[in-house]
Amino acid sequence: MAINTEINRLLNFAKQRELINHEDFYYSSNRLIDVLKTAEFVPEEINETLETAAPILSEMLDYAIRQGLIDDTVNERDLFDTRIMDCVMPRPSEVIRRFRNDYARAPKAATDEFYKMSIASNYIRKDRIDKNIIWKTATEYGDLDITINLSKPEKDPRDIAKAKLVKSSTYPKCLLCRENEGYAGHAGHPARQTHRLIP
């Protein structure tokens, strides 16, 4: 598929999942054409409903590799698809505002909506998590959930080599602390551009 169609597919997905509003359409499309280094954009009518953005992101990543924007490694793909999704993410203040409004009405619904947003933004990589093998076993202390984690791919030797070249830094302080919101990441630190915290 043409990259223009993939951009339109992602914008359609983001609107359906309420990551962006109608008013954000051109702002987000312009951010996407910048990240994907394409000069043109033409709005298209898209009629599809997807559970996650993974199929769209896969096409965009393949495009980025063909264009020489990234190398074909797991880490480069993860860094780049997070950068792509950041183009359709609400700002942290908007996420907090929505959460607080929802929480005032129904705390569980607020948490559920935040979780759905985390899946829609690909922060929670549901397509990978669904590959995990999970079962329950009864113990004297109650049921125990056992998971074989297949969602974390093996590191590519090229990614390991790049990580060795990254200058050591104390910023951000940890993988989940506040200063990660919007952090682009690098070979030694995952991208956190879609990371949102509720204080």
Regions found by a protein language model. Give the residues of each.
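Active-site microenvironments that recognize anionic phosphate/pyrophosphate groups
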Residues: M1-I198
